[in-house]
Amino acid sequence: MRRRQIALVMAAAMAASALSGCGGSGNSGSAATAAPATTAAAASEAPEAGGESAGETEGADGEAASGDKEGYLSTFDVAGAGDVSLDVMITSLGDSDGGPFLRGVMDKYMEMYPNVTLTPVECSMNDLYTTLITQATAGTLPDIFTMSEAYSANCLEMGMMVDNLPELLGEDYMNGLLDVAIENSTVDGTFVFMPWQNNTSAMVYRKDLFEEKGIEIPKNWDEFLEAAKTLTEDLDGDGKVDRYGSAFAGTRNDSAESRFQTFALTFGCDFITPNGDGTFTSGFGTDAYKNAMTTFVRLATEEGITPPGFVETGYSEAYTMIAADEACMFFSASNVLGGIYNANPEMKGKMGSFPMPTAEGVSPVTSFSSVGMTISNTCENPEVAADFLKYLTSVENSVAWNEATCRLPVVKDALTAICENDEVYNGFVEASDSAVIYPPFAGLAELRDICGECWQTVVSEGVAVEDAIANAAAKAEETAKTYSN
């Protein structure tokens, strides 16, 4: 794994005065000066933001069209582009919080430019990969579609997207993004997708209950277990647990499986390691993976700290449990707070976040990932598509997006504004100081699914955990070989 000590760029911007309102517990000073470590080879592979043209597309009069009046970095004469129709497939369109917001942004853009028609296309994140493969094979990709690092290598390999995305977005826009987000969106020197959501993983928790019971923030998984046991209670005296210490996602889909990849990191396990010669080595046969999977299953099913039904508990079920005062902790990106608040607005002010616990002997670590969008290679109006994406992710819209969903952006100025205003994100900021990004690997979705199959066979079919792990290791080794040159 390419490990990066990732201090969010906004920490540097806020170091002089604002970190007291947003930083983590005592570590924000180091975050202010740290920067993503980059090898010479990695630096040579990174795309130049904007290229020679600085991303400015000339309008009919030969001058770059200015979008300052609209509050975003528009560099194309959209109004002079004639009638334009774009299909926009963003996975959040189907969300109860993000969907209405996105449709509102699309409507406002069409009000600004009556010559543009934006058609929303829904697709769940869990169905994204298979949907894109089908569409790419049939030549029916939408003009704009969701992309993440889990599928970016496949996207590049299949030639799904335009090959000049930095130029379309422009140098000024690219310079406003977190450096780590740009790196995370880059495969073999090609900028594959425009990052949008900052998905640093941390633990969200009932801050009010921790304070009420005098529980200290757990630094390792043993301390996490003790905290969860303290929080697990029979509140009405009927002999049944009413509130559990934690929730774990155990469904067999990318949402739960990607969380386990973060969990495995905290045991020192890298799913996949590039060998530098086009081949890869799986980490599933290591003691770190065995310890991670064994502990994951034990915490989720054997310690009595989680609600029943682990393998049926997905992301939405987990945040609903917290909103209903049935669980107290869950690790995720910041968007889980939006789900909790949506389900129960009274939870605002009661929640907090802290960095992921780790296994004994493992330094603090978490994962950084980003969901974003890219433009199809079949799009007939890529300049207009890029202009809409810049409007969607403007500082104003990014802050409003956070208010609607609690998702953190990768636009530096927007991230600064959000974190200055709400300490609930402190744990995510502190966690960013020890975050890593995953290496591009076209078989990542397959490795994750092997993990989901592993814990589900243990819990649902009674397979011994040692046997399930051995089977997973064998499958992961084959996957690594399949995608090696």
Write out the residue ranges for each language-model feature:
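Hinge/lid segment of periplasmic solute-binding proteins
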Residues: 48-80, 124, 148-201, 216, ...
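Conserved C-terminal helix/tail region of periplasmic/extracytoplasmic solute-binding proteins
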Residues: 50, 54-66, 211, 301-304, ...
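Extracytoplasmic "Venus flytrap"
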Residues: 72-80, 86-103, 254, 438-442
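Short, solvent-exposed loop/beta-turn-alpha elements that line the ligand-binding surface or hinge
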Residues: 78, 163-177, 236-237, 245-254, ...
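Extracytoplasmic "Venus flytrap"/periplasmic binding protein-like
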Residues: 104-177, 208-219, 320-321, 326-329, ...
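Extracytoplasmic/periplasmic substrate-recognition and gating elements
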Residues: 107, 111-112, 117, 212-213, ...
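Long, aromatic- and glycine/proline-rich binding clefts that accommodate carbohydrate-like moieties
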Residues: 180-184, 351-355, 402-453, 457
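Glycine-centered hinge/linker elements that transmit conformational signals in sensory
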Residues: 228, 278-310
